[in-house]
Amino acid sequence: MCSKRELRMLMLHYSKHGECILQEIGAAFRGEHATDLLLICDGKETVRAHKLVLAAASPLIRMILEETPVLDGVTTVYFPEVQVSYFRLLLDFLYSGQVYVRSVEEYHHLQDLLALLQIKASIWKNSDGSGEGEPRKSEPLVDINRNTEGITGSSVVHQHPSRRRRSKSQDSLSGDSASGGGGTGSQAGTPKKVSVKSERHSAGSSVDGDGDRDREENLEYLDEVEEAIIKSNNNHPLHPHQHHLVAGSGGHHHHHHHHHHHRQLHQIKTRSRRSDPSANRRRSSSDPVNLSIVKQQQDVDSDDANIDVETIGTATTKTLLPPRYLDPFRTKRKAAAYYIHPADAEALKPMDHEGLLHNSPDNYVVTPHRKRRPGFHNSPAQNPPFVPSYLDDLRARSKCFLSAPPTYLPELRPGSPTSVRHAEIAAGLSNNNNSSSNNNNNNNRIRPPSADNKLAVAPFVYPWPTAALAGLPGGPSDLLGLPYVHGGGPNAETSPADLLQQMKNFENSQAELSARASAAGGGGGGSGGNGSGSGGVASGGGGGSMGGNTAVREYRCEYCGKTFGMSWNLKTHLRVHTGEKPFACRLCVAMFKQKAHLLKHLCSVHRNIINAPEAGGRYTCCFCSLVFETLQELVRHLSGHHNNLLLSKNLHE
């Protein structure tokens, strides 16, 4: 800081003001601090930037920000057909003042992006305006790096109205070094990078002879550099391609035609006499193209707030947006960006298929498993009661009906010698022998229909609903086990009263069979009784292979439909669904569904207690002082004498 007193006032001069501002802006861009502009490119890739920086360079961004109300401080602009890599190059160029492009294709895309954002060509093109004021003290560094991949030549040709020199023999330039007004040259044969220093003077109000002489020397020097590069790269094929840069002096604009060789890098640096020596530093790159911002001298009548839109010379402009996006913003040059404000952050995120799953604990259904962790209780609400299906009973008891439908039964054909009368079937149902209930009996076996006899069609019988069948005595399983009986011919009709009488007769016969089987088995229980409380249902039926008078009882689980032959097996199984754990370990308060699991737990987990080293290999009861020689004796002792201590309901006693 330095202070100066002038007209009784103090002026503070911030000598490094611009440098500090640029450093802060660069740090904010690299760290994405205080970003208020979100750019969404192709593939939903995002880039964050600052409105102030982009609005200062792009009239399109400034117009978007002026027309869009700011709600949350962040504005989102969509560029659906612009790759994010090109936008990063543009941001590096706007924030740092220069950018290195590695291919000609990227350079062209960057040019198109500059044109899309309506960025003036004077910002990045080297042009000198003629001013009427005093000469400028210093001018910044201007780097024009040309990538030669796909472009013929890397030289710069200045077309001057009065003079143009390109007559140098290649033989004379093979050993000479090119030198110019700045006293610095580059050899023609060896280097791939040619650095040129030239001295420029700002044009004043009048053009003198010294300025013309210096300009002519610069043109001659550039011609020598061009021919030196052509000499050093004469083996590379040429591809005609031109780029136009706007340059002028004394109010005239001259077009410079650039011819580039394949895979040849050429850099021309133009510096002023009073430029800072620190500006000599350059960043190295394998194949760069460098664009640098040039400070333009503003005209007196120019208005900074009104910036005209200019195109970039004759460079090829590719259509980056579809025509439907060009309607909202139509200026001197048609270019626009589809934007939405404010941004919907949820719409930008990709579809998350895993997020569709509800992770609520209520949606986790625990399947029955015999091995559970100690203390785990399964909620009965998560296990709906099992709804039994009587189709299995129908298949088991009426296998003969599966071979042919009732309309194809030989008993229904009139005049058949093997037909069975209704009276005989009723007598067979009331008979006490077991052969009437056996489906495999040869006397009642139904044979398949023959081809010589005509098929008889049985009359339609109204199907009984499930609720009506369940309300009838005897249970639905017995009704489904009732075989189809028809007493008349094929044209006879059966009344509901006859069907009810047949059902009652079948029910009485089944009751007599069950009573006789229970009496023979020593009071094994009645048919259809409750076998396990509310969790299981016990049912009885005739046993074909169990003997003459032995009834087979089965206990069905209402939750999963499993059947068991003994009630205690069903009772133990129901603990899987209800989560009941009636057995508990007093040593570690672990709970179990079965006593066998608790005894196994005591003999394995607490083996150091029941089989202590000081016991001499014998087993000690953990509840009393008795000692046993074998583990089986200890288990028998725990299960018998200390059975109450194994129950969880007596855990607190």
UniProtKB/Swiss-Prot annotation:
Superkingdom per UniProt: Eukaryota
GO molecular function: DNA binding; DNA-binding transcription factor activity; RNA polymerase II cis-regulatory region sequence-specific DNA binding; zinc ion binding
Function: Transcription factor required for terminalia development. Negative regulator of the JAK/STAT pathway: represses JAK/STAT-dependent expression of ventral veins lacking (vvl) in the posterior spiracles.
Biased composition (Polar residues): 145-157, 286-299
Any one cellular-component term (Gene Ontology): nucleus
Biased composition (Gly residues): 520-534
Keyword Repressor: yes
SMART domains registered for this protein in UniProt: BTB, ZnF_C2H2
Region of interest (Disordered), residue spans: 126-215, 234-305, 429-451, 512-534
InterPro entries membership: BTB/POZ_dom, Dev/Hematopoietic_TF, SKP1/BTB/POZ_sf, Znf_C2H2_sf, Znf_C2H2_type
Compositionally biased residues, Basic residues: 251-272
Cystine residue pairs: none
PANTHER family, per the entry: B-CELL LYMPHOMA/LEUKEMIA 11, TRANSCRIPTION FACTOR KEN
Protein name: Transcription factor Ken 1
Keyword set, alphabetical order: Developmental protein, DNA-binding, Metal-binding, Nucleus, Repeat, Repressor, Transcription, Transcription regulation, Zinc, Zinc-finger
PROSITE patterns the UniProt entry points to: BTB (PS50097), ZINC_FINGER_C2H2_1 (PS00028), ZINC_FINGER_C2H2_2 (PS50157)
Domain BTB, first and last residues per copy: 35-103
